[in-house]
UniProtKB/Swiss-Prot annotation:
NCBIfam families: L18_bact. It comes from the Bacteria. One of its GO terms (molecular function) is structural constituent of ribosome. This is Large ribosomal subunit protein uL18. HAMAP family: Ribosomal_uL18_B. It comes from Leuconostoc citreum (strain KM20). Keywords: Ribonucleoprotein, Ribosomal protein, RNA-binding, rRNA-binding. The keyword Transferase does not apply. The keyword rRNA-binding applies. GO terms for cellular component: cytosolic large ribosomal subunit.
Length: 117
């Protein structure tokens, strides 16, 4: 019987490969994106200290609409919170997901609202 590869295992494998090459610092944190079936989460992470500097998700009260609209709003929120915490330059970590759909909407919204990557 032919077995179909598990999409999430392949995603985690891609994410581990990329994470070996990129790392966030206090000066330039990593913008990490996690996407589930229903929600999307974004965090600014300082990997050196191992702390989250700012975060936003579709669970936040001001986020509503379709999944793509939620991703756009989360991108706007993470950019606003990141700039308020004093971060403008970040390293984008798509988390092994394709740069398409909700991940792309979040990234473009974050760029439009002032984050540089």
């Amino acid at each position: 019987m032919i077995s179909k590869p598990d999409k999430n295992k392949l995603r985690v494998k891609r994410h581990k490969r990329v994470r070996g090459k990129i790392s966030g610092t206090a000066a330039r944190p990593r913008l990490n994106v996690f996407r589930s079936n229903a929600n999307i989460y974004a965090q600014l992470i300082d990997d050196v200290a191992g702390v989250t500097l700012a975060s936003a998700s579709s669970h936040d009260a001001e986020v509503s609409g379709t999944k793509t609209e939620q991703a756009t709003k989360v991108g706007e929120l993470i950019a606003t919170r990141g700039k308020a915490a004093g971060f403008e330059d970040v390293i984008f970590d798509r988390g092994g997901y394709l740069y398409h759909g909700r991940v792309q909407a979040l990234a473009e919204s974050a760029r439009e609202n002032g984050l540089k990557f």
